[in-house]
Amino acid sequence: MSAADKHIKEIRQGLFALKDEKYKEFQKKLIPTVDENTVIGVRTPVLRKYAKDVSGTPGAVIFMQTLPHEYYEENNLHGMLIETMKDYDECIAYLDEFLPYVDNWATCDLISPRVFKKHKDELLVKIKEWMASDRVYTIRFGMEMLMTHFLDEDFKPEYLGMAADVHSEEYYVNMMIAWFFATALAKQYEASLPYIENRCMDRWTHNKTIQKAIESYRITDEQKRYLKSLKIK
């Protein structure tokens, strides 16, 4: 066995040592795009602690350089290790290597590198690149980063147009568009409302956006009533 294989085996054994059979049964129902035989069953807080322990070790570097992974939790661990990176360029390089292998919404949505907060200008360029991808979860990740970092103090109305310009037949992309605009309505209501009034999205995404928006405590009752009136029958 090579040194690289030994490191990967040790990391995998560590994951299996954290296995929770009941959680596995629960988790595999939430990720229908993932082969249930690849789900170990490690709770997210436990996995995050494991990622913290593994981060910075030679084994972690080898693990991240060895793709594709065999197990769902290995992908999640990979995403969590990327999150801890403090160098922006290194983080982006590892992300671009990893994103093509992301095959489910849960792995996609857990990745939120802290270093992004200090590199907004460069990040916006990458977000546009990710959102122009032909890969479902790369698009979803890019849009989630746009939602996370550019709907508050760094908001510009043009960012709404970036999201509205994404057209897809993929459920997990359209669900992300709905999530984005529901969040935008909560944070930037006046700027976002015309995208609903003018029906800039397909019927399903339009109605899902309204559904998610009216579930938000950040939207007033009056706004919720108006949004309900804009549903496409």
For each feature predicted by the language model, list its residue ranges.
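Alpha-helical scaffold domains
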Residues: 1-233
